[in-house]
Design a protein with these regions (language model features):
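Intrinsic, low-complexity N-terminal interaction/targeting segments
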Residues: 102-106, 115-116, 121-122, 127-129
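Short glycine-rich, low-complexity segments
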Residues: 1-21, 35, 40-113, 134-177
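Short aromatic-glycine-enriched beta-strand elements
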Residues: 32-36, 127-131
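Short beta-strand-centered aromatic/proline hotspots
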Residues: 20-28, 116-122
Length: 177
């Protein structure tokens, strides 16, 4: 999808096959992906979200988005500087960066009621293999999930949910091993 959006502006994105809009402040627009500071609900900034541009069906900038942006600006939540530097935000560079940095992230595809959290175990030209992090904060090393890179709609990372599971893992799970 050819899109024209501005950095530092709050938008809502409609993703193919999903009912829920994904909202956030645009940080970077790349070749294949957009990076937003994710606004989970109301005015709560919760990590980063990468949205695959080929699955964006529409972009909303209504009175609701403009009001939300004003509230976020009033509470100094719009001056977000991404701590990541992914060249061109292309599919290849994105997944290489996630793998090289050992980033724990969430993948969302078609079904918005299902997601997978983990880190890249291995990758090929077209696929990634994810070591899953369970809802109990444990690495399931006996299992892996395979995803076609081109089919991934949304990647989220540095969210409170993921960071909480990782903190629990570090404190309780790794200590007991």
């Amino acid at each position: 999808m050819q899109i024209h959006i501005n950095k530092g502006v709050f938008y809502s994105f409609k993703i193919k096959d999903r009912k829920r809009l994904e909202s956030g402040i645009l940080l970077v627009e790349g070749e294949d992906w957009v990076l937003i500071s994710s606004i989970f609900s109301d005015y709560i900034v919760d990590g980063y979200m990468l949205i695959n541009k080929k699955y964006i069906t529409s972009i909303h900038r209504t009175e609701k988005e403009m009001f939300t942006e004003k509230v976020l600006k009033a509470s100094d939540k719009t001056d977000i500087v991404p701590y990541i530097d992914i060249p061109h935000l292309s599919i290849d560079s994105l997944f290489k960066w996630l793998e090289d940095k050992h980033i724990v992230f969430q993948i969302d595809n078609r079904d918005e009621n299902q997601c997978w959290i983990g880190k890249i175990l291995d990758s090929t030209k077209k696929s990634i293999f994810l070591t899953p992090l369970t809802p109990k904060g444990e690495w399931d090393r006996a299992l892996y999930y395979a995803f076609r890179k081109a089919n991934v709609r949304i990647i989220s990372f540095n969210s409170d949910y993921i960071n909480s599971l990782m903190a629990y893992n570090k404190k309780h799970v790794e200590e007991s091993e």
